Swiss-Prot record:
Pfam families: Methyltransf_3
Transmembrane segments: none
Keywords, sorted A to Z: Metal-binding, Methyltransferase, S-adenosyl-L-methionine, Transferase
Function: Catechol O-methyltransferase that can use various catechol-like compounds such as gallic acid (GA), 3,4-dihydroxy-5-methoxy-benzoic acid (5OMeBA), protocatechuic acid (PCA), 3,4-dihydroxy-benzaldehyde (DHA), dopamine, caffeic acid (CA), luteolin, quercetin, and 5-hydroxyuridine.
Impact noted for substituting K142A: Retains a low but substantial activity
GO biological process, one term: methylation
Any one cellular-component term (Gene Ontology): plasma membrane
Protein family membership: Belongs to the class I-like SAM-binding methyltransferase superfamily. Cation-dependent O-methyltransferase family.
Protein name: Catechol O-methyltransferase
């Protein structure tokens, strides 16, 4: 970067990635494989993934539920945070995405602690075993977030943590918007704030993925 060039969020992300994450062949290969399979580029960033990993480790999560696998990038981070004795159940609607994720998880050396469940999450959630869960990460179709959170509360232990991605939508949650995802994000935050079984907050984020954020809630 030249002396006269102002830093921007993607530049800062690049610095943080090189400084705090470093080279990680398994993660790089997971992203490359997802691109090769033409999966949408909507995975969490490396910093967000590292946050999930550290959060899982900090609360000693041994049973993790993920709703929305995509290519398994965030799943790898969650599995690392849960550790060798942990178990991650990840739900994915698209069979193609699940296939890519399974290969990525195997390459990353965490496939033995991850179960990939294929199908609409609202159909598979009632069938899940392996709970109660210590940590739930929701990053799927936004219009069903409220239903996913309701299921997360049922399946989680008291004191568990629920994380919901993409809840700021570039500030779209404040606008009179035709964006269904922004409307869903606002409804999600309102539900989390009003639910007697949750104590919630939200953090805005900025980086190469733009202006967004995540909600975090403790199950009471």
């Amino acid at each position: 970067m030249g002396m006269d060039q102002q830093p921007n969020p993607p530049d800062v992300d690049a610095f943080l990635d090189s400084t705090l994450v470093g080279d990680d062949p398994a993660l790089a290969a997971a992203l490359a494989a997802s691109d090769a399979a033409e999966l949408p580029r909507i995975a969490v960033s490396a910093q967000q993934g590292k946050f999930l990993c550290l959060l899982a480790g900090a609360i000693q999560a041994r049973r993790v539920l993920e709703i929305g696998t995509l290519g398994g990038f965030s799943t790898i981070w969650l599995a690392r945070g849960a550790g060798p004795q942990g178990r991650v159940v990840t739900l994915e609607y698209q069979p193609k995405h699940a296939e890519v994720a399974r290969v990525n998880l195997q390459r990353a050396g965490v496939a033995d602690r991850v179960e990939v469940v294929v199908g609409p999450a609202l159909d598979t959630l009632p069938t899940l075993a392996g709970g109660p869960f210590d940590l739930v990460f929701i990053d799927a179709d936004k219009e069903n977030n409220v239903a996913y959170i309701q299921w997360a509360i049922r399946l989680a232990r008291r004191g568990a943590v629920i994380v919901v991605d993409n809840v700021i939508r570039g500030g779209g949650i404040l606008a009179e918007s035709d964006d269904a995802d922004a409307v869903a994000a606002r409804r999600t935050l309102q539900m989390m704030g009003e639910h007697p079984g949750l104590d919630a907050t939200a953090i805005q984020t900025v980086g190469r993925k733009g202006w967004d954020g995540f909600a975090l809630a403790l199950v009471r």
